């Protein structure tokens, strides 16, 4: 399993001769970690001014890039922050996917700056790992940016969008997030970035899969994952997996199921 990573106090630098639009790779490190016969390679770089982390199998043909959109209070290290995240990321990397995450302005709640960053991250990752196939994987708050990018037509080829306890309604966030959302989105502008207010055909022909805990008091499934499926499901393919258990939301990080679903999308497109 991929070990939990912490923000390094000191970083070894090596130049990367890549320049893409506003993307400047200013520093990167890579290291290998052998676990259960799998060797991982970590890439550290800066994209659009934001720290970014990529994890892939060393010397392994990359079948697709998975762009991970982190939750509130997290950053690019979230995909290895604890056992559920680490196990999910390991399953994806072991199956041949490169998983890439960005700090993306922290608690940006899908604002224009974070969307631009993720757009550049997708293009940079696809170029670096030499693949045209990209999947979106969002966690909580990250679904706001992911959904908006998917609706506007990203420059990369997105084969599928998966999300874990996704937040899709900026007007129905938990009380602890209300002040942050209000600061980022004055009342007159929130509708332009709120996925639940997009036209019903905004995700036409898109394939999506959501892992949602119906008992989660912070991210209510009926106001987010299932409400989103009800609004957009007539023109797109959306499946919602209930993942409630005594371990809280940990059971929603289903790496093996993600690998299976991503593989199904690869066959379809």
Language-model features, listed with the residues they occupy:
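Short, surface-exposed "cap/lid" segments of acyl-processing enzymes
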Residues: 48-51, 58-91
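Primarily recognizes the serine-hydrolase "nucleophile elbow" in alpha/beta-hydrolase
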Residues: 127, 133-189
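Alpha/beta-hydrolase active-site loop
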Residues: 108-129
């Amino acid at each position: 399993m991929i070990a939990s990573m912490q923000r390094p106090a000191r970083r070894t630098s090596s130049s990367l001769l890549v320049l893409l639009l506003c993307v400047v790779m200013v520093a990167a490190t890579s290291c290998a970690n052998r676990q259960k016969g799998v060797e991982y390679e970590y890439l550290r770089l800066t994209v659009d001014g934001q720290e970014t982390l990529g994890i892939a199998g060393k010397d392994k043909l990359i079948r697709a890039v998975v762009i991970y959109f982190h939750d509130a209070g997290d950053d690019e290290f979230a995909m290895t922050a604890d056992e559920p995240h680490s196990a999910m990321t390991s399953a994806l990397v072991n199956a041949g996917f490169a998983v890439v995450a960005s700090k993306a302005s922290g608690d940006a709640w899908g604002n224009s700056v974070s969307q631009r960053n993720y757009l550049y991250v997708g293009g940079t990752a696809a170029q670096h790992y030499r693949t045209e196939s990209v999947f979106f994987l969002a966690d909580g708050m990250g679904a706001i940016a992911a959904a908006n990018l998917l609706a506007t037509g990203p420059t990369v080829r997105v084969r599928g969008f998966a999300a874990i306890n996704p937040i899709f309604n900026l007007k129905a966030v938990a009380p602890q997030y209300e002040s942050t959302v209000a600061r980022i989105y004055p009342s007159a502008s929130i509708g332009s970035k709120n996925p639940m207010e997009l036209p019903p055909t905004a995700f036409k022909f898109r394939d999506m899969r959501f892992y949602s805990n119906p008992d989660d008091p912070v991210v209510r499934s009926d106001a987010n994952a299932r409400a989103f499926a009800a609004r957009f499901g007539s023109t797109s393919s959306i499946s919602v997996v209930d993942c409630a258990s005594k371990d809280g939301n940990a059971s929603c990080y289903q790496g093996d199921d993600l690998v299976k679903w991503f593989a199904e999308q690869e066959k379809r497109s």
